[in-house]
A protein has these predicted regions:
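A ligand-binding cleft/hinge motif common to bilobed small-molecule-binding domains
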Residues: 87-91, 217, 222-240
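Short beta-strand->loop
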Residues: 98-105, 119-121, 149-152, 239-251, ...
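Extracellular/periplasmic bilobal clamshell ligand-binding domains
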Residues: 302-336
Length: 336
């Protein structure tokens, strides 16, 4: 009898062990600078498509993410980057902190958004835009701005919000596009002189790319320098706001994914990166972003058409190479 009970107990423990093994999930740690609103929507998709992964998403602003990765360089705590500005990734490729990986299906993507050595793979793009509160504009008798130059009007003093470029990728693309417009690549200082004039009207620099639009929508500012889909979301929610894409040329950024060197959960990281460029994932991105890197997927209908926007031809390599110098100078001039 004792032997029978012992045998049954052993069988029970084996079943329990095997069941537990079957239910065990592979862990993966993901760093991202995608907006919280986006991640909340994407979560349902990746949980459905990757049921065997235990996915830990850590969301940080663009600047904070970079600082954290540098601090953890000797002992990486994340396995991959999901949706980070190419300008920043270029720098980390140079620093040797990214492991080349060719995710499944990458051949279907537009090649110009894929790193030649597969150090990163672009997934989408966003465009800098002004969020203009029409109610505040009317109350204060302000003219509708068409571009950056219009914001130098003294009437806008204290009524403009803009992202801090040291913390926000959106902020950096805005100031880097202005600097390039004014000849910074040729060594000219005109862009910095323009930013000094703009600073005189600045109400607040904010450590977020989306909050200038959200604060403007709530009536705290007349104009918030932000980016496309955040303005669209505020308008969708019923706030009295309108898009303005700078007539001088709107800056834009590409967001990309990368495998981190020293990833502790390599197989799980690769599985997530495969999913992150799948058609299903791209369709989710397209609900927020201006364009995705998988051809044939339409963008959201409430965003203005590409033909209606003048894009400034951004030089991502120049931006990456000069990023630290630009931010150091910006902080010296404007964070007093």
């Amino acid at each position: 009898m004792k032997r029978k009970c012992l045998a049954l107990m052993v069988c029970f423990l084996m079943v329990a062990f095997l069941s537990g093994s079957a239910l065990a999930k592979d862990k993966v740690v993901v760093y991202t600078s995608l907006e919280t609103d986006e991640i909340d929507k994407y979560r349902e998709a990746y949980l459905k498509d990757l049921p065997d992964l235990e996915i830990h998403i850590i969301r940080l602003s663009t600047g904070e993410l970079g600082a954290r990765m540098l601090a953890e360089r000797a002992n990486p705590q994340a396995d991959l980057i999901w949706g980070w500005a190419v300008t920043n990734l270029e720098d980390f490729v140079t620093k040797g902190m990214v492991e080349p990986y060719k995710p499944k299906g990458v051949e279907k993507l537009d090649k110009k958004f894929v790193h030649s050595g597969f150090s990163y793979v672009g997934i989408d793009m966003y465009i800098a835009a002004f969020c203009v509160n029409t109610k505040v504009m009317k109350e204060k008798g302000l003219p509708m701005p068409k571009g950056w130059n219009d914001l130098l009007d003294p009437k806008f003093k204290g009524l403009i919000a803009m992202p801090n470029p040291a913390a926000s990728g959106t902020g950096f693309l805005q100031i880097s596009s202005i600097l390039q417009m004014y000849g910074a690549k040729e060594g000219k200082e005109d862009g910095w002189e323009f930013l000094k004039k703009l600073d005189k009207n600045m109400g607040q620099y904010i450590k977020s790319g989306s909050r200038p639009a959200k604060m403007t929508a709530s009536g705290e500012f007349a104009v918030g320098a932000s980016f496309d889909f955040v303005v669209a979301e505020q308008k969708k929610q019923g706030f009295p706001v309108e898009f303005v894409f700078p007539i001088e040329g709107a800056g834009y950024e590409v967001e990309a994914n990368a495998l981190l060197k020293g990833a502790k959960n390599l197989a799980a990281a690769k599985k997530f990166l495969d999913w992150a460029i799948s058609e299903g994932a791209m369709k989710e991105y397209s609900k927020f972003k201006y364009g995705v890197t998988l051809p044939g997927i339409p963008t959201r209908p409430d965003l203005p058409k590409f033909s209606e926007i003048k894009l400034y031809p951004m030089d991502f390599a120049w931006q990456a190479k000069n990023r630290d110098e630009i931010l150091k100078k910006w902080e010296t001039l404007f964070l007093k």
